[in-house]
Amino acid sequence: MRFRSDSRADHQHPKKQGSMDPDTIQALKYQDRSSSSSSNNKPKEKVGSASTSPSPTLFASNDSVKVEIGVGSSDKEKPDVKVSFFTIFRYASKRQLLINLFGTGMAIAAGAAQPLMNIFIGKIATVFLHFTSAIRSGDLDAIRAAHSDVYSTINSDALILLYLGIGMFFASMLYMAVFSYTSERIASNIKYAYLSSLFSKPIDFFEQCGQGTVAAKIGSDVHLIQIGIGEKLPMAIMYFSTFVTAAAVAFAFSWRLSLVLLPIAPLILLAGGVMGALTKGCKLVELDCIAKAASRAEEAFNAIKILKAFSKERTIGQEYDTLTTDTKAAGAKAGRIQGVGVGALLFIIYAGYALAFFYGAQLIARGELLPGRIVSVVFANFAGAFAIANLFSMIENFTMATAAASSVIGTIQQDLASSELSESRRNEEKSQTSRQLATGYNAELKLDHVHFAYPSKPERPVLKDLSLTIPSCVTTAIVGLSGSGKSTIFALLQRFYAPTRGSIRLDDVDISALDVDWLRGQIGVVEQQPTLFAMSIQANIELGLPNRHTRSAEELESLVVQAAKKANAHNFITALTHGYQTEVGSQGFLLSGGQKQRIAIARALIRDPKILLLDEATSALDSKSEAVVQAALDEAAKDRTTIIISHRLSTVRNADNIVVLGPDGIIEQGSHHELSIKPNGTFASMLRHQDDKTKPVMVTSEPEIVDSSHSLCLTEIPTMEIAHSLEVSRTISALADSVKPKDPSKNFEPPGESYASPAADGVKQDAPKTDSVGLRTLLHILIKDPETGRLAQLYMLGSLCAAIIGAVYPVYAILFGTAIEDYAPCNSSDGRPCPNPARGTMLHNNRISSGSFFIVAVGCAFISFYHVRSLYIAGSRVTHRLRVLVFQSLLCLDASFFDDPVNTSNDLASSLSVLSQGIYGGVGPTLGSIVQSLATVIVGYAVAIGYGWRLALVVIASTPLTITAGLLRLRVLARKESKTKQAHQHTTQQACESIGAIRTVSAFNLQPQTLQVYQKNLENASRSLRPTMCYSSVLFGLSQCVQLLVTALAFWYGGRELAQGHTSSKGFFTILISVVYGSVQAGNIFNYSADFSSAHSAACKSLSILKQAKEVVAEAQANDRDVQWNTEDSLPSGQIALKEVTFRYPQRPTCTVLDRLSLTIEPGTFCAIVGGSGSGKSTVLQLIERFYTPESGRVLLDGYSITEGDPARFRKYMSYVPQEPTLFQGTIGWNIALGATDENPEDVPLAKIQQAAELAQLGDLLASLPEGLNTQLSARGVQMSGGQKQRIAIARAMIRDPRVLLLDEATSALDPASERAVQGALDNVSQGRTTIAVAHRLSTIAKADKVIVMQAGKVVEEGSPRELFQRDGLFALMARLQGVSF
């Protein structure tokens, strides 16, 4: 989620949170009225309950927009909502509907132009046939009269056709411009409504709906909707208008013949309807697979370092392949359905022509119809039938749009449907109660017999009949084992969930009756894993302040600085180049964990809440920062109700009330003193096993260590300052001056050969260059890929059949011209029956022509089936394989690629769908349509030249007009495609970011501002596309009117050729149909220009990604070499060395993180790395794991440079446990097995998984779960507590029995009992292996063989814990601040 980095502009002119543009408000009001039976037109607030999920109020009063996270049941309890194609237009405003109505009129007018042209074709045909009859009769007077009629008719009618062409240009241009504009606005309205709807979902909904799913729906699904209601819908209206007008013309000229041909259109529509209905099911399956795969992809990109650490890129890539495999089957099934449908369509059309010519001949023979009129009727039916065929070809677009709408709008409509239950009464009660608590309430909280189980696991209660009173204005600490329900209490207090039974009361008022926004506005929250947004530090802190838009910029700045000082963040912020205006990046990745935590604390403190919830608020801080921040929190806790969740009992020493939770409820409760002196008390036992051995040190100012490591660039590294403490009188700055980094030359020199470190091999972040042959090259690669099957054969068969279908059209032209000339002997102007023997000859020839048409109809039916089926299957295989290849290639790229702000996990997951969807337009059925059109043009031109080269060349010479217009439009569409993606990439990322941080968004009532900014960004994106829309519409109009202009030219010049004897009526009509309508097919090629533009763009981008991945792999293979470990078991001993390493993060090239760092860690030893937040500790681990490559220097394992060769060769001997545990959706056992060296987690023996679980002390947790290791984890493992997730992550690391174990605060999230057990397990498993632990809590490194103290990217102290403590230097100061002695 992105907000304005500098919010001062808004402060000068405060805006209401709910302000929107009129179109959006009207559209959302309209769809709300259409979906709700309530007659109350006033804005409605929502309240969550235990049984329903409130719907979003998408527009509001003058004060605010009310949107909440629901607390009710999941979607299973919501009513099913049917979504049709026309449901999409509920999200159009009245103004947009009126504009669409105008555009519809223009499309109807454009569609009527071609059938009206047939009136004049029939008139000219009568004159031409009359001239032919006169020539055959030899009557000079008749010849002169017919000659004069030819000239007179072609001059007047050609001019009329010219006027029709000009009118069609303006009509086509206007309808395309109108629908391009309104489709963009409606799509924006749907995106806005969808995000608003997600904000009203119960929190358990997001356990299954990840950011990848949101990206797929907003990016891909809404794009499908926009295509359906944009360019495709007005063209469908135009084709339908063509059909209706053509039918009217046909009936006007011969109702008998038209009546016989009348069933053709219903049969076409019936075939199309059945095909569309059957295809929709296939598309729904495909979209569902893509959404699930997108969620998995987003998960993988978010945890890319975990995947690389355990070399599981291939495993996740194969799983992604499996998740998307069903798209191939769905595509094949859709291909068979479409093949049968299109074959039936062509059979109906050509068999209809056979019937028309056969029955028309009977009417002519009886004198009931003139040959010229039959030409008008047949041409009109020809135009109408092919209009229906073109309309038929768009059914897929409308089917996909409807399927996408069912997915997106269905989600919105479910919430609207479930918001009708007594909302007025609930609103009234809620508002009254909130007013009673608005002034002077005590903030006492009571949990009364609360029973709760998460909706995803209803059989496993977390809280069982819990009764607890939390007194007002005191500090209550909740401690206990991981999974005992501590964090669940916080979720219930914020109304993320509702108790299954019992109640939670605030001053004796059930919180379910309170305005949820008001309630959350009274609470300040600091989470264990802080969430920051891609905005400035100041803007992030401001988010915690209610009514911030009503305050001046000066007041806001003052409050932000005060809050930052309280949170011990002011010094490091002011040291940054841009200070408080520094952008923190997506999810705050530009800051260290401790820096993010302090900003989160400042965000909570700035609102001066009545209730303060602290969930391990200092877990990510170093010892000095923790001491100061803890003192600040103790001060902030005064005169407010504060609840602390903590595993570190030293942080709850000053709590007034301590509650010890167990699996079955409260074990004991009391003050710290009371509980600590209980002889057999649980708390006393926990306290005895904590390593806090001395009293805490009082700190009155900030012991900050600030440097440039893993954080933003500093203007300078400030001298560290600390006030006098009880035991420390010297300053840290003095210590920093007295402690010098060790001489690198004195470090241990590892055995083995030394290798020069290569330059950094990170992937360049420059925009990919366009490949001029992108689509062709990509197809060549995929055709050779064995995973795509017999792709070449499918394309050959599909293209050959498409070419045959295209060649049928000129054959039809020959048959048509022959049949028309055969009518010439019976061309009577007085309506007399045709005399013999001309009648017998005409009927005989007609039977041959009609039979030929029927044979063509049967052949087309079979050939078109194979044409469509083959290309559908080929397109599905190509898009599936491309999606998998791009995903696997992205996983191969360096970690630095994913640090780039433009390569967020949401954008990358969304791009997989966008690229595959784009490529489908050039490799699926569209490719067959283009081959078909080209065959029609080539064969048609050849036939025309054979029948009359003079007329053919003149008409063919006009073809460049069509081609030029199409090419220009192609270029504009390519530019539009690029601009559209660029414009909406930011909005998609914002939506995904807000959903990924849904708890934070909800806790701080950020939904109104999120929606306001999102809606503004959507408007800006739409506005930037308008010029491109205009250019494209003008060129589209030109391409559409060319047909009429060329037809006018053909009649004018053809008439003269006929009059001068250079051609016959048969030759004229053969040339007319072959060339003029061949030119139309040439124009139709460019109707697919948008599809090919998207395909070409997608191919170029895909090739760029594949090329980058190939280069990374090739470089690794080129530098790879056999490694011979100098040990008995042929395994590395585990010696780690960094030699003169200098490193800067690729995204911060001006900031030195490690400055010529040298250190050596002996094999089999336990080495701890400590230091202030951002001193470079975690960076050392990431270099050892080869996530990054040093700028200079070497990183060695047993003397071998790990920066050379395949990183997996070295990583298989290492295990990595990050500070913030990352789990995947899947079973607990699968997550643990992911760390094994086996290629497939499914192949890991159960005993091995169980052994790793025992080492990580997971036995009790697994025993409490009905399914044990088979328990399914949701996305990111959100139903597990932080400690439980961390233990699973430790088990994942231990299962591979590593030679080098890397721990980044591995036990920071554990409760005391779990920490003690896991620490003991880590101590045991560290025997015989090299263990490197980054730690803030010095009690966890008491058994370390060696401690390295880092500052500003250098080693400042080194030795055993006891040696460093006795040295009374920086380490000793850190230990005393934590109350630890060695």
From Swiss-Prot:
Q: Which intervals hold domain ABC transporter? A: 445-688, 1136-1377
Question: Which biological process terms from the Gene Ontology are attached to this UniProt entry?
Answer: transmembrane transport
Q: Which domain of life is it from?
A: Eukaryota
How would you describe this protein's topology in the membrane?
A: Multi-pass membrane protein
> Any keyword Transport?
yes
GO MF annotation, one: ABC-type transporter activity
Q: What is its main location?
A: membrane
Residues annotated as region Disordered? 1-56, 738-768
- Which Pfam families has this protein been placed in? ABC_membrane, ABC_tran
What are the transmembrane regions? 101-121, 159-179, 233-253, 259-279, 339-359, 374-394, 800-820, 848-868, 911-931, 951-973, 1034-1054, 1067-1087
Cited SUPFAM superfamilies: ABC transporter transmembrane region, P-loop containing nucleoside triphosphate hydrolases
- What turns on expression? Expression is strongly induced under conditions of nitrogen starvation. Expression is positively regulated by the cluster-specific transcription factor rua1 that recognizes and binds to the specific 5'-T/G-G/T-C-G-C-A-T-A/T-C/T-C/T-G/A-3' upstream activating sequence found in all promoters of the UA biosynthesis genes.
Q: Per its UniProt record, what Gene3D superfamilies does this chain match?
A: ABC transporter type 1, transmembrane domain, P-loop containing nucleotide triphosphate hydrolases
Q: Basic and acidic residues compositional bias: what residue ranges?
A: 1-12
User: Where's the ABC transmembrane type-1 domain?
Assistant: 101-400, 797-1094
The listed locations are: Cell membrane
Glycosylation site residues: 62, 397, 680, 827, 903, 1020, 1324
Q: Which InterPro entries match?
A: AAA+_ATPase, ABC1_TM_dom, ABC1_TM_sf, ABC_transporter-like_ATP-bd, ABC_transporter-like_CS, P-loop_NTPase, Type_1_exporter
Q: Which residues bind ATP?
A: 480-487, 1171-1178
Q: What keywords appear on the UniProt entry?
A: ATP-binding, Cell membrane, Glycoprotein, Membrane, Nucleotide-binding, Repeat, Transmembrane, Transmembrane helix, Transport
Write out the GO cellular component annotations.
membrane; plasma membrane
- Protein family per UniProt: Belongs to the ABC transporter superfamily. ABCB family. Multidrug resistance exporter (TC 3.A.1.201) subfamily.
**What is the documented function of this protein?**
ABC-type transporter; part of the gene cluster that mediates the biosynthesis of the glycolipid biosurfactant ustilagic acid (UA). UA is a secreted cellobiose glycolipid that is toxic for many microorganisms and confers biocontrol activity to U.maydis. Export of UA is presumably catalyzed by the ABC transporter atr1. Atr1 appears to be quite unspecific, as many of the UA derivatives produced by cluster mutant strains are readily exported.
What protein name does the entry list? Answer: ABC-type transporter atr1
Organism from which the protein derives? Mycosarcoma maydis
Taxonomic lineage per UniProt?
Eukaryota, Fungi, Dikarya, Basidiomycota, Ustilaginomycotina
